[in-house]
């Protein structure tokens, strides 16, 4: 299959670093505004291309992900939430997969590595391979959701105060909700503190319907949800999985 370097795509007015058929590979070494990143990504996707963002050495060096780093993430069942990084000096490609985040933003993940030479890059991207023998996991930090919320209220953190206001409108208090609402979530990565609000909305649906319906719950969520920041991840799919998590946790006897 032919490989084109910096091939110009006139309809998109974009020039990917590498073009493999309909796969546009972008190696992002310098900082890029989130708006421009989203524009470029959607331009590829809307014109029938897959886009593979690979971050350079200046990215993914902190315990918390920046907005751009999060937006470069993908999702599938085998790799979970994942993203890519290139070490151009040592000619290695890293996959950070099964990424999770605590409520305070600390990131945990597994990593796998390939050398550039002797490997089919397109196959690596599309086959969902994980090199089990090279997996490494960062320290997972667990946090008490209620204690974290209490600290945010003390410091009058804007998003948390906004959720508290929604509690007040319902004659509730953010720190005195059902215990399951404060449990850990694999959706903090996407939703951060909104997890607690959406769980409260789920519980309201549970009391009204006994068996909550995703569509009616999601209609409620849409009134409060923030802009979706992950152009390579299907939004509704994530919310359906979050809904399933609510169903599971709310059945616990805590």
Where are these regions (language model features)?
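Basic, amphipathic alpha-helical patches used to engage nucleic acids or provide basic targeting signals
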Residues: 32-52
């Amino acid at each position: 299959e032919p490989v084109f370097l910096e091939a110009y795509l006139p309809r998109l007015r974009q020039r990917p670093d590498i073009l493999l058929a309909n796969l546009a590979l972008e190696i992002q070494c310098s900082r890029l505004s989130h708006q421009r990143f989203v524009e470029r990504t959607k331009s590829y996707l809307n014109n029938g291309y897959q886009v593979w963002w690979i971050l350079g050495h200046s990215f993914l060096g902190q315990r918390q992900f920046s907005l751009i780093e999060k937006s470069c993430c993908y999702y599938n069942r085998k790799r979970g939430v994942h993203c890519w990084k290139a070490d151009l000096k040592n000619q290695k490609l890293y996959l950070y997969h099964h990424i999770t985040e605590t409520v305070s933003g600390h990131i945990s993940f597994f990593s796998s590595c390939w050398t550039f030479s002797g490997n089919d890059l397109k196959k690596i991207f599309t086959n969902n391979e994980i090199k089990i023998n090279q997996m490494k996991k960062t320290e997972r930090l667990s946090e008490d959701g209620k204690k974290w919320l209490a600290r945010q209220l003390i410091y009058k953190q804007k998003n948390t105060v906004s959720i508290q206001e929604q509690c007040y409108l319902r004659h509730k208090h953010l720190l005195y909700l059902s215990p399951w609402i404060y449990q850990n979530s694999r959706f903090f990565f996407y939703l951060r503190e909104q997890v607690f609000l959406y769980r409260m909305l789920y519980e309201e649906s549970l009391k009204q319907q006994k068996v909550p319906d995703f569509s009616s719950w999601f209609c409620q969520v849409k009134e409060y949800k923030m802009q979706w920041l992950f152009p390579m991840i299907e939004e509704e799919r994530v919310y359906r999985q979050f809904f399933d998590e609510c169903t599971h946790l709310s059945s616990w006897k805590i």
